[in-house]
């Protein structure tokens, strides 16, 4: 874990699992990634306790490919619709292409390392962006998750 806002778990997937996902995608084969979704939810539940809330359903895992030809905007993005944004880095053999996170308004940012198989999850309201990939291809899986009010939670006034 890096900090409480941006969390990195190395070896979430093995290099072999990542290569399998990339190669199947390149060959046009669809994959059932349910086991990865379940593993993500397990990690979130193990690392966070949500008083009065529970994790909603994980959005569909999207396979994303970035190249030097991808059009990039270096403006900071924010997603206020979800609670967490989740990225699984499938490879690290490309130049630049860093996920960057603005943690305060003085333009200093945290840059997550490029590590094959790592899981990065962060609060979706954090300003974030991707620096341009300068060579080769960057492959990730990306999804989001919302929090739902827990039906079992009893609200009380103190």
What are the residue ranges of the model-derived segments?
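Fe(II)/2-oxoglutarate oxygenase catalytic core
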Residues: 1-119, 125-158
């Amino acid at each position: 874990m890096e900090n409480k806002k941006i969390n990195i778990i190395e070896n979430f997937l093995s290099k072999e699992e990542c290569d399998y996902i990339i190669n199947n995608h390149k060959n046009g084969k669809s994959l059932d990634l349910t086991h990865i979704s379940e593993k993500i939810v397990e990690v979130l539940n193990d690392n966070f306790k949500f008083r009065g809330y529970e994790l909603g359903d994980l959005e569909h895992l999207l396979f994303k490919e970035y190249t030097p030809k991808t059009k990039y905007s270096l403006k900071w993005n924010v997603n206020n619709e979800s609670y967490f944004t989740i990225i699984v880095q499938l490879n690290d053999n490309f130049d630049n292409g860093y996920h960057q996170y603005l943690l305060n308004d003085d333009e200093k940012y945290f840059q997550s390392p490029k590590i094959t198989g790592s899981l990065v999850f962060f609060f979706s309201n954090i300003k974030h962006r991707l620096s341009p990939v300068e060579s080769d291809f960057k492959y990730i899986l990306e999804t989001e998750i919302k929090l739902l009010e827990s039906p079992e939670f009893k609200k009380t006034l103190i």
